[in-house]
């Protein structure tokens, strides 16, 4: 009884590795045509510039960058996009890695594919089928355009996609705190992700009811209200 779960877990790791290798192979082909290699710096790097400005003690960028979409207030120039990706890049910029956006975009893309696979496995989809549909959702869709490119518009969309999948997965697993925290991070990348909240709450409600079928909504709130703390901190 103890051997089978271990074997299943190890098999899942192998399947996830296969999935990541497939995604990487498709990316490699795309990069040969686009030149968007993950070790290259990006011209449209608003989040890197924002992280650098924060480390220098400024909220504004210090000067104009005519090729970027910036907000102007009191003759100061600000990044006009939600800031969550800048928080992700901050520790890397701190150590001097000012081209980290490309590698972060690649890692986030792989993570999105992995969580697509994990969601499918939650519903007891056979592993090969789960890999196929995870690939179909990612490299088999227009997601590929945004995922293999780390420009400011695309990396935010890429992060929002992955974080939303993570929020869905943890909602299905009845881990409310993680689910809502990742959802809040997704909103910090793309504000329209807020529209997913009703669907997420429905998944959370169903997952809780599976474990506690007698609980009403007010009971769930009383038992799980502390799960709102991470989301509130992020917001």
Regions found by a protein language model. Give the residues of each.
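Transmembrane-helix motifs of polytopic, lipid-linked glycan transferases
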Residues: 99-125, 166
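Perimembrane helix-loop-helix junctions
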Residues: 195-232
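Multi-pass, polyprenyl lipid-linked donor-dependent membrane glycosyltransferases
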Residues: 104-107, 139, 143-171, 185-196
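Extracytosolic helix-loop segments that constitute the early lumenal/periplasmic catalytic or substrate-binding loops
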Residues: 47-77, 84, 171
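Start-transfer (signal-anchor) and selected internal transmembrane alpha helices
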Residues: 1-42, 130, 224-231
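Transmembrane-helix signature of polytopic, membrane-embedded enzymes
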Residues: 116-142, 162, 175-178
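Juxtamembrane segments of multi-pass membrane glycosylation machinery
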Residues: 74-105
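Membrane-interface transmembrane helices that cradle and orient dolichyl/undecaprenyl
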Residues: 164-178, 210-211
């Amino acid at each position: 009884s103890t051997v089978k779960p271990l074997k299943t877990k190890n098999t899942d790791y192998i399947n996830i590795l296969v999935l990541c290798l497939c995604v990487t192979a498709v990316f490699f082909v795309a990069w040969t045509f686009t030149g968007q290699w993950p070790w290259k710096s990006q011209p449209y790097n608003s989040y890197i510039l924002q992280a650098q400005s924060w480390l220098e003690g400024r909220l504004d960028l210090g000067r104009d960058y005519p090729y970027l979409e910036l907000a102007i207030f009191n003759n100061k120039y600000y990044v006009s996009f939600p800031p969550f990706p800048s928080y992700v890049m901050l520790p890397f910029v701190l150590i001097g890695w000012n081209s980290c956006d490309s590698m972060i975009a690649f890692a986030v893309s792989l993570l999105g594919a992995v969580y697509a696979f994990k969601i499918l496995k939650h519903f007891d989809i056979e592993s090969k089928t789960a890999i196929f549909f995870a690939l179909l959702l990612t490299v088999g869709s227009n997601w590929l355009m945004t995922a293999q490119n780390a420009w400011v518009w695309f990396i935010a969309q890429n992060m929002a996609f992955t974080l939303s999948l993570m929020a869905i997965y943890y909602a299905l697993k009845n881990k409310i705190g993680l689910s809502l925290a990742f959802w809040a991070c997704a909103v910090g990348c793309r504000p329209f992700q807020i529209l997913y909240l009703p669907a997420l709450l429905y998944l959370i409600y169903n997952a809780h009811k599976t474990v506690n079928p007698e609980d009403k909504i007010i009971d769930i709130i009383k038992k799980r209200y502390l799960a709102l703390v991470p989301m509130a901190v992020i917001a």
